[in-house]
């Protein structure tokens, strides 16, 4: 490996490269544009494009692409070469117009009715706050994507809008709190990414993995995660080689990959980066997922990002670590040396409490997918109920501050290891609560409900917007206040009285919490379609309209896309199951019966006195499972044939209420048959082979 500081960002047109290569006036103007949010002028764009092209050509680049994030949840790109005819030859050109604007076909991406097939024009626009980078001899330019009529058709545009809204209201709030030196507040995120690695040759033998990204059949292996021996265990050499190359490729492209380790389930791993500005973190996470999958193939493996690729062991999520940082370098979620008397810090915590409580449904919607429904509430991931963990010490501090009591910082004691040579460790104010969906972890909030394959843009868009709304209210009160400290304490009191129900420090997996949450009036949206229905509620439409995030039409379109994607995912899985049963699993069951019959006949040929009881019992069981499979497969095929052609919502409800139960029953019969069949007859790799094959 080369020198890491030299390697890091070597394929990124970052601030260092810009400062070195751009004319001084152009560089200064670009920085001013990025800081102020002003539009990029054509003359500045032309200079930047020319310098960017020269830098890219120095790295062997031949093409460029506007890299955007449509509402498919994955990235999209179209490669154009720098080639331009010049007489009998060609020259390499890249104009400012090509840098700042592209025109992909908007009708071919999900639009929820915003674009029809005959309304194809869409635009991509350069996001100058997220630096361009090089991959596969191509210059990747991060862009936003909108329709011909200006509606957002991507995940980046609303995210950037929400960051602007949060900055505006947070600066107002801080000014009202006496922070005169702050001119900008930026949300930052670090997204922990979980994934599975399995052998490529086994993946190729599983139709369910190839078509859907997860297994739809499979009996549990004798050993799963019961011994807790995989979590933080020794990383296998093949996986370590993969992680090493992944780190290097991410570092080259400016993604600050920091930590990697084995996760709880066999074959499960995690990568965590440093925090960075939210839109850059979102771009970085999309790039991370793409490189994870590509490099795994190079190492003879396949990276699975599905939320629940294997039944019976933990699924994969993505923890969204969110905080707010001022342009003066202060983390607003860091209480400093005296958090008990840091009123700005305490009011920031109250703002997040209020935002999460008032907009529970919106946060739940951002993590609602067909895949994530298999995780949430399954005693391996947070429940589908939103709650916040602060820890008893911090919760008590908030209560004391609200009451105006003389708060003192809690004394943090040293841990007694009872080994003289060991260093003294200071204990944190509170323990960690891994069952909480939204936990305060010292200087950030960790939103743990995201699915592993999801973009982090949606949850951060909602979180930024909801917190902006609350900070705006606080600013209104504080700006009219004659006694700031008294107003702060009143706001803290009101928050605890009106939104204290969202705080929960106990076991989120327990049945008692389900009952308690219901008593508190918290939402428990168990399935994705239940959540989607709340998106266009009046208060949510009003929130997004007020802060310029979504129009009513944009919000309705997203609701349609949510329903449509959910139904399509389940429909594809159901069709895959039917095909696998017809063409693989039932034939295996018939072959097992055939072998038993041959064994029985062979016994009788040896001696009529030999017992065939084992063959009879096994044959009866296998025949029963075969009958169940045929009946279940026929039912599923009929349900697929009768799939409604009505609204997207009705399709999603049909998929949830009719297809999923039939799919679950079909799987039970197939998994039982797998355990009855001889290994050489089973037509696909087993869980044991997949999970322990690397």
Where are these regions (language model features)?
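C-terminal amphipathic alpha-helical interaction region
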Residues: 492, 497-694
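Glycine-rich, acidic/polar active-site loops that bind/position phosphate-bearing ligands
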Residues: 120-305, 314-317, 324-562
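Active-site-proximal loop/turn and secondary-structure-junction residues that shape catalytic pockets
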Residues: 44-48, 68-70, 97-98, 145, ...
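Histidine-centered active-site/metal-ligand motif
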Residues: 43, 63-66, 261-263, 319-321
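Flexible inter-domain linker/hinge segments
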Residues: 1, 6-15, 168, 172-175
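Active-site core of metal-dependent hydrolases
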Residues: 7-119
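Short linear, low-complexity motifs centered on an aromatic residue
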Residues: 73-90, 104-107, 112, 206, ...
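Hydrophobic alpha-helix feature that most strongly marks membrane-spanning transmembrane helices
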Residues: 69, 87, 297, 327, ...
């Amino acid at each position: 490996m080369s020198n890491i500081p030299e390697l890091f960002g070597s394929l990124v047109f970052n601030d260092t490269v810009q400062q070195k290569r751009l004319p001084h006036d152009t560089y200064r103007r670009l920085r001013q544009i990025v800081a102020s949010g002003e539009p990029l002028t054509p003359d500045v764009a032309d200079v930047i494009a020319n310098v960017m092209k020269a830098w890219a050509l120095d790295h062997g680049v031949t093409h460029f692409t506007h890299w955007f994030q449509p509402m498919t949840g994955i990235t999209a790109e179209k490669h154009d070469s720098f080639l331009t005819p010049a007489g009998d030859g060609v020259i390499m050109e890249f104009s400012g117009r090509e840098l700042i604007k592209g025109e992909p076909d908007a009708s071919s991406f999900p639009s929820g009715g915003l674009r029809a097939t005959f309304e194809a024009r869409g635009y991509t626009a350069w996001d100058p706050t997220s630096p361009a980078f090089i991959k596969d001899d191509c210059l990747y330019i991060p862009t936003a994507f909108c329709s011909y009529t200006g509606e957002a058709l991507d995940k980046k545009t609303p995210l950037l809008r929400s960051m602007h809204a949060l900055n505006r209201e947070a600066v107002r709030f801080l000014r009202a709190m006496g922070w005169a030196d702050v001119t900008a507040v930026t949300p930052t995120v670090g997204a922990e990414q979980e994934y599975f690695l399995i052998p490529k040759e086994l993946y190729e033998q599983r139709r369910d993995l190839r078509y859907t990204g997860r297994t739809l059949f499979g009996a549990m292996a004798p050993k799963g995660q019961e011994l807790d021996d995989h979590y933080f265990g020794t990383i296998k050499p093949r996986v370590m080689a993969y992680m090493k190359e992944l780190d290097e490729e991410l570092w080259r492209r400016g993604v600050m990959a920091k930590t990697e380790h084995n996760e709880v389930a066999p074959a499960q791993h995690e990568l965590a980066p440093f925090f960075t500005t939210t839109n850059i973190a979102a771009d970085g996470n999309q790039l991370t997922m793409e490189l994870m999958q590509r490099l795994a193939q190079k190492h003879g493996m396949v990276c699975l990002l599905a939320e629940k690729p294997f039944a019976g062991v933990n699924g994969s999520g993505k923890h969204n670590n969110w905080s707010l940082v001022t342009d003066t370098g202060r983390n607003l979620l860091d209480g400093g040396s005296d958090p008990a008397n840091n009123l700005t810090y305490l009011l920031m915590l109250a703002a997040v409490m209020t935002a999460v409580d008032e907009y529970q449904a919106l946060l739940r919607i951002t993590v609602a997918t067909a895949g994530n429904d298999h995780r949430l509430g399954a005693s391996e991931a947070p429940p589908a109920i939103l709650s916040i963990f602060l820890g008893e010490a911090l919760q008590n501090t908030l209560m004391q501050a609200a009451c105006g009591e003389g708060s003192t910082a809690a004394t943090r004691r040293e841990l007694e290891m009872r080994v003289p040579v060991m260093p003294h460790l200071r204990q944190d104010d509170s323990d960690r609560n891994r069952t909480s969906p939204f936990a305060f972890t010292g200087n950030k909030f960790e939103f743990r409900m995201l699915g592993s394959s999801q973009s982090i843009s949606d949850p951060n868009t909602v979180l930024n917007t909801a917190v902006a709304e609350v900070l705006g209210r606080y600013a209104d009160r504080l700006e009219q206040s004659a006694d700031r400290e008294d107003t702060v304490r009143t706001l803290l009191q009101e928050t605890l009285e009106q939104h204290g129900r969202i705080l929960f420090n106990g076991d989120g997996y327990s049945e008692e919490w389900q009952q308690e949450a219901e008593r508190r009036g918290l939402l428990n949206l168990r399935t994705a379609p239940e959540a989607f229905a709340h998106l266009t509620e009046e208060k949510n439409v009003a929130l997004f309209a007020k802060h310029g995030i979504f129009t009513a039409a944009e919000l309705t379109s997203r609701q349609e896309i949510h329903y449509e994607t959910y139904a399509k995912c389940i429909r594809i899985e159901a069709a895959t199951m039917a095909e696998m049963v017809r063409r693989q699993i039932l034939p295996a069951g018939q072959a097992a019966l055939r072998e038993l019959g041959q064994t029985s006949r062979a016994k009788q040929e040896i001696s009529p006195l030999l017992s065939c009881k084992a063959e009879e019992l096994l044959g009866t069981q296998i025949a029963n499972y075969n009958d169940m499979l045929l009946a279940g497969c026929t039912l599923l095929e009929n349900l697929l044939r009768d799939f409604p052609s009505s609204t997207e919502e009705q399709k999603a409800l049909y998929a949830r209420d009719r297809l999923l139960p039939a799919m679950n029953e079909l799987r039970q019969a197939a998994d039982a048959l797998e355990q009855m069949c001889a290994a050489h007859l089973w037509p696909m790799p087993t869980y044991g082979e997949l999970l322990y094959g690397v």
